[in-house]
């Protein structure tokens, strides 16, 4: 009986330790992962099988938690970095939509050219709102300043078109995380929603890193000084 109680107490202590590590942040999780990896590498031949199983399970759980933490940190960093650009791109897309809607009402609903432009603007607005939180935001309305990295620009343009195509498909199928109608009501992506996802494109990731200066140029192209003042009020 006493032996069983000691086992339960040890298991409880191990669970409590894991819980504390999980809540301690990315750096502590990384340190614990390294400790467990070293332990299993050096003493796997002499450790009891029950201990090995427990440590391997802990290691697997910690690696998963590390991935989740790093993903959350990436989402948080992207949200902070691209919030202003996305804010003004949404504003610009809404203005385009309202202008086109007014023209259609004035000229009639049979104007196919205006209808196509209206659809394109709807797609753009859905793009801004549903763009994945885990990726560097690719501006819809970038500046025309000549780039020193033409290949990077080409890959970025391709990635943008891929997302626009996916948005159009999801919009037509009514499977967007946030629909066009919901966007007009002010809805955004839920906190636990990442947004749209495409298959990884490593060539793009390697070639499309944008400096803060380039990000700033994109923002300056999207908005004017008066609008920037509105944002900070």
From Swiss-Prot:
GO terms for biological process: maturation of SSU-rRNA from tricistronic rRNA transcript (SSU-rRNA, 5.8S rRNA, LSU-rRNA); nuclear RNA surveillance; re-entry into mitotic cell cycle after pheromone arrest. Residues 223-233 have a biased composition (Acidic residues). Residues 26-109 form a coiled coil. InterPro entries: Efg1 (IPR019310), EFG1_rRNA-proc (IPR050786). It is found in: Nucleus, Nucleolus. It comes from the Eukaryota. GO terms for cellular component: nucleolus; preribosome, small subunit precursor. Residues 194-233 are annotated as: Disordered. Keywords: Coiled coil, Nucleus, rRNA processing. Its main location: nucleus. Involved in rRNA processing. Required growth at elevated temperatures, resistance to hydroxyurea and for cell cycle progression. Belongs to the EFG1 family. Present with 2840 molecules/cell in log phase SD medium. This is rRNA-processing protein EFG1. The lineage of its organism: Eukaryota, Fungi, Dikarya, Ascomycota, Saccharomycotina.
